[in-house]
Regions:
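Conserved catalytic core of the tyrosine transesterase superfamily
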Residues: 1-201
Length: 201
């Protein structure tokens, strides 16, 4: 029978927030828990499941890094923690006294341990705070992760290093962020500007 080639699916570019929009979200989060949550998702490029799975033992303040255990693809990785984030996490721990998971829900599990913050709870926090910040883009947890990768590339971090920090198996996945990066050498300009710059002296 006649075999027809499959029609390639349209690939949508990731939604990315500006640094100013990230700042607005941090400023709009009233609860310390939510500020730290957003700071970790964006500041470490975490998936929703990864931020929910953070345990106190995964935080290494001396080495300024977070151990992400068994993330997607079953590969552990380490990501750096900023000094600002470390201060916020310490304040949060001091105020909330979590025992196992960094972010907990309102119920205990069968063994009496703190239950993890629910996926719905994380997404609700991110979406409601983005709206409060006046951001018109459709913001989800992965939007903050996309923004992390894009901003690192714009800051000149090597793409292979970004791949490692994101936990991507294939560098091609990381390269998708190049389509939304505003790299200095890639900014489009009119050739007329070059003519004036060279010839109007």
């Amino acid at each position: 029978y006649l075999h027809l080639p499959s029609i390639p699916k349209e690939k949508k570019l990731p939604v990315v927030l500006s640094r100013e929009e990230i700042w607005k979200m941090l400023q709009s989060a009233e609860l310390l828990k939510h500020r730290v949550l957003i700071g970790l998702i964006y500041g470490c490029g975490l998936r929703c499941m990864e931020v929910r799975n953070i345990e106190l033992k995964h935080l290494d303040f001396d080495r300024k890094q977070l151990h992400i255990v068994q993330s997607k693809g079953k590969k552990d990785r380490y990501v750096p923690l900023s000094d600002h984030l470390i201060r916020g996490i310490k304040r949060y721990i001091s105020a909330e006294h979590p025992t196992t998971f960094l972010f907990t829900g309102h119920t205990k599990d069968a063994k009496g341990f703190d239950s993890r913050y629910s996926q719905r709870g994380v997404q609700w926090a991110v979406q409601s705070i983005s709206k409060k910040a006046g951001i018109l883009k459709d913001v989800h947890t992965h939007t903050l992760r996309h923004s992390y990768a894009t901003h690192l590339l714009e800051d000149g971090v090597n793409i292979l290093q970004v791949q490692k920090l994101m936990g991507h198996e294939r560098v091609e996945t990381t390269m998708e962020y190049l389509h939304v990066c505003q790299l200095e050498q890639q900014k489009v300009h009119s050739p007329l500007d070059t003519v004036f710059a060279l010839c109007s002296r």
